[in-house]
């Protein structure tokens, strides 16, 4: 392959994101300079933060039309002009949505090949680290605590619930729709669920957490956060994510 296929941001969305906001382009294959590594992108992480980057500067510079869509990936080293990296090495890198990228070695994080490669972007990646440290360091759950998590069927929320179960907690997941709620209980072992789309949020929450809430992991804010705050026990902890 002599060209680099890219998915670029064609225009900045003002409302709902759609295919019309992206464009497929081809660019010359990047050539790594001294201290850089040429990468072949294997898997790209699609995250909720991607949408926020289109709205303006956050913890990273704002995206502009015509740029390669930003995003992290698991990539394989193709060629290296940097010590410590060799062809075949697996890395996490902020490559963007493209087939290849040449990046400074200092921006790469080596990865160990273990299990499905997709786990390096999820369980061992940003979602997993967010869930693990957000729950255990901020939420500080104890065995027997009631832990409630919103957006429970999402990448972070689903991991929060599973970690809380390992800690011996009663876990309540808040999600939208019967299918998501059923998945949380049958596949992930949540003790109770709240379907915010079904109405009567406060009543559902009271039934799911009759002893109150000791830890609330908030992924959404708004009305759901407010409802959970009114159910918090004395000394309860709230971890705000996002």
Language model feature labels by segment:
Residues 90, 146, 170, 236-238:
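Short glycine-centered segments of the SAM/dcSAM-binding site in methyltransferase folds
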Residues 79-81, 95, 151, 175, ...:
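Conserved "cap/hinge" positions at secondary-structure junctions
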Residues 6, 41, 131, 164, ...:
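Terminal peptide-recognition signature
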Residues 28-46, 54-97:
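Glycine-rich beta-strand-centered segment in the early N-terminal region that forms part
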Residues 125-198:
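Mid-domain Rossmann-like dinucleotide-binding core that forms the NAD(H)/NADP(H) cofactor-binding site
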Residues 187-188, 192-242:
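Glycine-rich cofactor phosphate-binding loops and adjacent beta1-alpha1 units
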Residues 69-76, 87-151:
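NAD(P)H dinucleotide-binding glycine-rich loop of Rossmann-like/cofactor-binding domains
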């Amino acid at each position: 392959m002599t060209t680099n296929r890219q998915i670029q941001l064609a225009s900045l969305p003002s409302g709902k994101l759609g295919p019309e906001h992206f464009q497929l382009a081809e660019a010359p294959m990047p050539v790594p300079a001294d201290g850089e590594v040429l990468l072949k992108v294997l898997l790209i992480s699609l995250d909720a933060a991607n949408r926020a980057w289109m709205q303006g500067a956050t913890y990273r510079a704002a995206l502009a039309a015509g740029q390669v869509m930003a995003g992290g990936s698991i990539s394989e080293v193709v060629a290296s002009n940097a010590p410590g990296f060799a062809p075949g090495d697996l890395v996490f890198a902020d490559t963007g949505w493209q087939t290849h990228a040449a990046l400074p070695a200092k921006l790469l994080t080596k990865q160990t090949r273990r299990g499905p490669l997709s786990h390096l972007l999820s369980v061992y990646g940003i979602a997993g680290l967010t869930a693990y440290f957000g729950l255990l360091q901020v939420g500080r759950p104890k065995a027997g605590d009631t832990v409630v998590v919103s957006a429970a069927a999402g990448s972070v929320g689903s991991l929060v619930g599973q970690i809380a179960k390992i800690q011996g907690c009663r876990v309540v997941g808040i999600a939208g729709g019967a299918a998501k709620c059923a998945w949380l209980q049958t596949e992930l072992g949540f003790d109770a669920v709240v379907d915010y789309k079904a109405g009567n949020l406060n009543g559902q929450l009271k039934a799911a957490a009759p002893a109150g809430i000791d830890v609330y992991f908030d992924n959404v804010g708004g009305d759901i956060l407010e409802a959970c705050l009114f159910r918090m026990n004395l000394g309860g902890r709230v971890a705000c994510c996002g």
